[in-house]
Amino acid sequence: VGSEMCIRDSYFPHFLTLRDKTTGEVIRTIHNAPFHNAAAAKVKGTPNLKAVFMWPRGHAKSTHMDIFVPLWLMFQPKRLINFMVVVGKSEDSATRLLGDIQAELEHNQRIIADFGKQQGNASWQDGEFKAANGVKFLACGRGQSPRGLRDREARPDYIVIDDLDDDELCRNEKRVHDITDWVKEALFGALDVGRGRFIMVGNL
């Protein structure tokens, strides 16, 4: 699996067409911008990455960092991801975000044709599931106890925080400090020792 752009074009054409909302007709094909490719290469090439990606609204930050990039890492000849955690403003929000990657693993026939059945025989439920190759996926809400962020002895090695804040939180300085402390202490502390990609995405 050569590049993130290759896996995107090969396995996710349904994300790459802009359609007319009324007629459903294809208006144009959506291509990666250079910053998408640079970000993906940075994530892949830095096993202990700690990064914030701030892109304008509508620039597919969640699509890339929550779906394309982790699946690209997962399907490398030498697997580069073992335990992914998606963190949202609530557990429900995180579960919805994680549901996109779960749907691709379960129903994407191009992935299944090339990499085999992905739905594991073990637990396969909304918000927490394990793929057939053993990669674990978990949704986590803001402020949630990190004690659940383990799979036996395994720790997360890909944590992505997606739109953690909201208007109510931003108006309360103490809560902002509390969540900042939770991110720095609980989430950082949950990462696999010595390695692990920690990514935050948000709007400019």
Please give the residue ranges for each predicted region.
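Short, small-residue-biased leader/transition segments that mark boundaries at the very start
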Residues: 1-7
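N-terminal pre-P-loop "Q-motif" helix
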Residues: 30-45
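Phosphate-binding P-loop
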Residues: 42-50, 78-79
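Walker A/P-loop
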Residues: 48-68
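Walker A/P-loop NTP-binding motif
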Residues: 66-78
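Conserved nucleotide-state-sensing and coupling region of NTP-binding domains
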Residues: 87-143
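Conserved RecA-like ASCE ATPase "motif II neighborhood" in helicase/translocase motors
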Residues: 127-186
